[in-house]
């Protein structure tokens, strides 16, 4: 059994190795194959494990022995599902592994905006506290989360976890979800009402035809002029130029995003020039414990497939 990892470096490192997969066969790891390299490298594979590698007809057609594709991810829009169905290739994903991590990072971004940890740490590192006339210099204004209204767009497992943390901060929680849901202490409202009432708008929906470019000029204009926009979902849910303009024109108070439309970030990404904008490099999901959990799910999926009882099947 030959198992090929096509973009191992997106998950694997010295803290989270892939050695637990070797119980199932020979494991060949490639750090990050280009699209043009994939077809040749997986030609004799029985299984392919990937994260974001594009696996379409052209990259799969040489892999005559391929019976299984495992994903280091929940989303599978990089896989040609129809081709896999036609050729008897089982595709399994990994879900619900990053709920706590993404909720945690969401609040790391929110707290950075309101508590100014980065700015005050630099203030001290630059020696300015030593020169301060007071023990507590009010250089950057701070704000409490208690009493603020957070609006959660997408109320799946991550949105629900964010709501629970918000409640611990004594925040008012609004939520918008396309399907009807209920949760204690959460007021479900329309999308427009959420935009208009929220001090913080945080996005936790999948990227699909409904959510693509969901946040653009019109939506930012409906938000409070001191509101914080947070995106730890997918870059495609927002129009980056419109977010830039909303920030520059003081239509909203700030933005904190972990995902962009193009990743890694392009040299000329306009949000790098935006004011009051915090950007992290798509790492909300990536704590060591989270990647360990993901690796275990992927290994369990492989074992279940080999035993004839596949789980987490998407095709």
Where are these regions (language model features)?
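N-terminal glycine-/charge-rich "phosphate-binding" loop or analogous flexible N-terminal tail
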Residues: 1-45
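Short beta->alpha connector loops at strand-helix junctions that form conserved
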Residues: 31, 72-73, 89-100, 177, ...
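Rossmann-like adenosine-cofactor binding region
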Residues: 56-59, 178-270
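Phosphate-binding beta-alpha-beta segment of Rossmann-like dinucleotide-binding domains, i.e.
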Residues: 87, 95-149, 314
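Rossmann-like dinucleotide-binding domain for NAD(H)/NADP(H)
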Residues: 91, 226-315
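Glycine-rich Rossmann-fold phosphate-binding loop(s) that bind the pyrophosphate
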Residues: 155-156
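N-terminal Rossmann-fold NAD(P) dinucleotide-binding loop
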Residues: 159-160
């Amino acid at each position: 059994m030959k198992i090929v990892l096509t973009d191992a470096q997106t998950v694997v490192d010295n803290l989270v190795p892939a050695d637990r997969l070797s119980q199932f066969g020979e494991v060949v790891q490639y750090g990050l194959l280009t699209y043009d390299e994939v077809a040749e490298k997986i030609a004799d594979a029985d299984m392919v494990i990937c994260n974001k590698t594009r696996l379409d007809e052209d990259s799969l057609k040489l892999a005559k022995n391929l019976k299984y594709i495992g994903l280091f991810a929940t989303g599978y829009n990089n896989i040609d599902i129809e081709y896999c169905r036609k050729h008897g290739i089982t595709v399994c994903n990994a879900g619900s592994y990053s709920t706590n991590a993404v909720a945690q990072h969401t609040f790391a971004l929110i707290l950075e905006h309101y508590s100014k940890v980065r700015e005050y740490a630099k203030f001290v590192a630059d020696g300015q506290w030593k020169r301060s006339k007071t023990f507590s210099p009010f250089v950057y204004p701070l704000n409490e989360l208690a009493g603020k209204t957070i609006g959660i767009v997408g109320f799946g497992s991550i949105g629900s976890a964010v709501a629970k943390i918000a409640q611990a901060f004594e925040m008012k929680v609004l939520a918008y979800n396309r399907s009807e849901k209920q949760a204690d202490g959460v007021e479900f409202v329309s999308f427009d009402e959420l935009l208009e009432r929220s001090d913080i708008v945080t996005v936790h929906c999948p990227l699909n035809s409904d959510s693509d470019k969901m946040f653009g000029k019109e939506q930012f204009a409906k938000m409070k002029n001191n509101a914080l926009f947070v995106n730890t979902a997918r870059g495609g849910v927002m129009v980056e130029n419109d977010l830039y303009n909303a920030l520059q024109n003081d239509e909203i108070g700030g933005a904190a995003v972990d995902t962009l439309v193009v990743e890694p970030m392009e040299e000329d990404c306009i949000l790098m020039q935006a004011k009051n904008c915090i950007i992290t490099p798509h790492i909300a999901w990536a704590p060591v414990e989270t990647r360990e959990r993901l690796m275990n799910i992927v290994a369990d999926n492989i074992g279940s497939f080999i035993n004839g009882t596949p789980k987490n099947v998407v095709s």
